[in-house]
């Protein structure tokens, strides 16, 4: 049990130094903050998927995956002739 507490203390110290110690916890100033941020981001994505439906959520991800530092996903899709069905982005009523 003491080693678990020691490990959490080390992770907390690293988080306070600005290192990301939990996937999705970027920006937290402590281990607890990292945990909370990661959980909130995960829950937010799940909620969005429920609102849009699996198909719309996947289509939105396709568009986002096309984005670069120079242009948005929509601009790149138009330039390359990739069809993105934005009607699927609508939330379910």
UniProtKB/Swiss-Prot annotation:
Matches recorded under InterPro entries: LEA_5 (IPR038956), Sm_Hydphi_plant_seed_CS (IPR022377), Small_hydrophilic_seed_prot (IPR000389)
Basic and acidic residues composition bias: residue spans: 9-19, 31-52, 73-93
GO CC terms, sorted: cytosol
Name of a matching Pfam family: LEA_5
GO BP term (any one): response to abscisic acid
Residue segments, region Disordered: 1-93
PROSITE patterns: SMALL_HYDR_PLANT_SEED (PS00431)
UniProt function note: Lea proteins are late embryonic proteins abundant in higher plant seed embryos. It may have a role in desiccation tolerance by acting as an osmoprotective protein or as a desiccation-damage repair protein.
UniProt family annotation: Belongs to the small hydrophilic plant seed protein family.
Name of the protein described by the UniProt record: Late embryogenesis abundant protein B19.1B
Organism, as annotated: Hordeum vulgare
